[in-house]
Design a protein with these regions (language model features):
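Bacterial N-terminal signal peptides
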Residues: 14-27
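Catalytic phosphate/metal-binding cores of nucleic-acid and nucleotide-processing enzymes, i.e., regions
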Residues: 85
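Bacterial N-terminal signal peptides that target proteins for export
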Residues: 3-17
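Bacterial Sec-dependent signal peptides at the C-terminal "C-region" and cleavage site
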Residues: 24-36
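N-terminal secretory signal peptides
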Residues: 33-79
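Active-site-proximal loop/helix of nucleotide/amide-processing enzymes and allied scaffolds
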Residues: 33-39, 89-102, 106-196
Length: 196
């Protein structure tokens, strides 16, 4: 990952400060269970944007990734998606005036050999390392949100929330939970599923 300029870091700090002020001004906000209007707006943008990116991600069987944040005019926006491989994606650095508030990526097409319906431990670790929340869409059309402060990932919406891979086959014996912590995902990754 490339080093960010001091100006970019200042813009990130400014966005974080504005977000903290918004959270303080919104009484009753507590963790993942309650959402502020800014977060709701971000969730809506995330689902709409991932819905647009998902079809190409499935067709190309590649992860796509990028960022959500404030553009130079202060508008909440998404960066253009970067194409990755079938198992990873490294986002291009956004313009210097873009203030990152969250990351996003897709999991590509369905595969019976890959647990792509939940974020991976690497997905969570990357968001924790960047100190930025992360959105993920899955082949079934689920959307997940990793909340860095709470160190948890929650399923924002279930199958079909964004355009799904039509070849997706659910595995009832390995159905995703509604939320995971990093250790929960480690257990899931090491679990052997006999059959679907």
């Amino acid at each position: 990952m490339t080093e960010c300029s001091p100006t970019f870091r200042l813009l990130q700090l400014k966005a974080a400060l504005l977000l903290m002020i918004a959270l303080i001004m919104s009484p009753g906000l507590v963790g993942a269970e309650t959402r502020s209007s800014l977060t709701d707006e971000l969730d809506i943008l995330a689902v709409e944007h991932l819905d647009k990116v998902q079809a190409e991600s499935v067709r190309e069987n590649s992860e796509y990734c990028g960022f959500f944040g404030f553009d130079g005019s202060g508008k909440l926006a998404a960066t253009e998606p970067t194409k990755g491989s079938y198992f990873a994606c490294e986002s291009d650095q956004p313009p210097e005036e873009f203030v990152i508030v969250a990351s996003y990526h897709t999991h590509g097409a369905y595969s019976a050999h890959y647990d792509s319906e939940v974020p991976s431990t690497d997905d969570l670790s990357a968001d924790f390392e960047r100190h930025v929340d992360g959105y993920l869409s899955t082949p079934a059309g689920r959307v997940w949100l990793t909340l860095v402060e709470e160190m948890v990932t929650i399923q924002l919406c279930g199958p079909g929330c964004v355009v799904p891979d039509t070849t997706f086959k659910p595995c009832p014996s390995d159905a995703p939970a509604s939320k995971y912590r990093l250790n929960d995902l480690k257990v899931r990754e090491n679990k052997i599923v006999e059959s679907c």
